[in-house]
């Protein structure tokens, strides 16, 4: 049976709890430091509370420590990881191989390790190599197709595969984007991305002739694979990840609810093939609608091969749902909309004007299809498409208690008879069973706890079945809901005072909670001794799985640009040397003026030169080719294809000459290279 996990983002404790309540099987949250979203750090205490809450439902908490780590940060990083292990975190996401080396060598982590999407996994070979290093789960690049995902699954059939299914898309393969660091001194590999890909560019040819003027040529639509979850599961994916660790709580509620409902439908259709990774059913107080939550328009990206409409060239902002067209404008006061949608005071609307710019405004008053904005938009024209990017009524629904998650239980009660010399009942036995799902087929009912209450039972004057069931179903504010109360062996014929029934119910729930915690403790440790983690869990020893230079060249660019391996500390340098990489080049963030620390032969010598290393990090990176350029991005998105000029795929022949350049408003230019054999677009900085 295949387990399906919905993995949701948690900006903070509140968002994490909301994700669990709305159906997530796991959440991922930023560590106090060193996560790939520097603005999304959380305290250890908040993470501990989130673990306690999630574990009640068998849900998991993953913590991201997925940046590259400088040597002077290593001790703090390892100490934090050990603390995360102690508070019950279920999985750790890593990018830095130096951190991996120390975690394994010092036995600092007792549970799952996941390779971050920052590891840039595009091929079966790289996925397999990472599993030999100790990673139980591989997070794949967002750009992969179903066939590519299937090929990776076939290479690592006994390991978990995590795929992104919803949210913002990075235009470059994750982990190998250096544009933000180059242009603004803010490294994406350090969680400080400056959103270079959401900026305006001119597109110029080799003669400086303008092809496109001030458009968002690197800005992609948002990913949405809601209708392809089963396809992904059939390809081998087991975890479905929602992007958005900086998104607000209403975003989390709506998106998680939509995807959880879809996964439930898949499980219900084939209960003997699929099951959810956690327990509990959710009652929603709203109907999920992805169009009503922040989005730039949706795309399936490359799931079924290259598609023409993946970019959002007009705006990087949220557009929202289409609600109609402007029909008629009355001066500077109001306008009429041709629509079947209804509006509320305070709705946020927007449109793309004649200059292909997004304009937005707030509705002040509504009279049917006639809207009175706070200020009439200057560039609105009849016939323009209108979008709603803030639905006040929907947001109000989400602001209230919008869902409740409960675990179905089945309670069985029966009288306990005496021995053959004493036929009268000696008390009541109550047993509680947890249901994985409420469907009869594949419901996975299993016994959890039981209670015996010794008391003298007397026959009731009238049937007690309804009263006993009602009393035992009063589970109040607990996380449990009585799906069924079964009375066995004539239990309904005996009288039991309500006070006794209440006591039995409370004791039963207490025992259930204890049993769940005991089972949780066992599952968290996974049944292995932590000393086995380093050398007995099927992972290679340091240097055991050496690669040749050709094997280390995951893509052609890796053979030309050594900084793509993101080696930022002494441990990572030694790791790659032991595993056969040569030459070993420091991370882009360290710059080409290699500090003496980088050339150290021992860690002690390295540590002595840390201050020089710090000083070097303040300098501009200087890794360049013979043209004085640096490779900043590798993209499957292709501007030439999106504009209709890909001759390989039937596009028109361009009238301009290559190379093409993207140019920022301040004059900085970036050369585009179209690597058609790889079907990839690379972006280079100029001198």
PLM segments and residue spans:
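Surface-exposed amphipathic alpha-helical tracts and adjacent flexible/coil segments at the periphery
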Residues: 1-22, 26-36, 46, 50-51, ...
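An active-site metal/cofactor-coordinating segment within enzyme catalytic domains
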Residues: 39-43
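Well-ordered mid-protein domain cores that form the structural environment of catalytic cofactors
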Residues: 78-128
